[in-house]
Amino acid sequence: MVSAKNIVMSVAAVAALAASQASFAADEFGGLDSVAIEAGGGEHVQVVRWSAQKNWNKNWFARGGYHLSGYWDANVAYWRANRWDDIADNRKNLAVIGITPVFRWEADDKRGLYGEAGIGASVFSSVYTNTHRQLSTAFEFADHIGVGYVFANKWDVGVRVQHYSNGGIKHPNGGVNLALVRVSYGF
């Protein structure tokens, strides 16, 4: 079950791992640039997601100390659905894995305020049928928009609005919307 205590413990674990393994991750895992944890939810669902990022290190459309860049985000998530098959208190746990290219408008030094958006692909451990939201396929597109702030010590705190949908591949396709808080540490 997702609780405040579990979220705090997960954030602490990611922070400890990131701080102790930063140079190892950068060298041994093909130059990963950061790790993140996200937590939040939507209508009768709570989500915790862990991810790793690889920056593109691009400077497109540079002006006024900002530019467009981005990163690859590989993630795995735990979803706790609380109204499975539209039955009150019928719970189901799901695993979700995904990959998303994310475009970020950021400062040239990669610090301070940013805005980002991404559209990726995800696979659910089973077809989502929580409340009146049915997605009909295990494959889903995952798009988001978000804002955040990167501190000088490489910690990044942000918020996102995430939408999952199969893009009309199969009906019904009710879509699932989530509000998420994200904490990341850059190596």
Indicate where each model-derived feature is located.
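Extracellular loop and loop/strand-boundary signature of outer-membrane beta-barrel proteins
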Residues: 36-38, 85-90, 129-133, 166-170
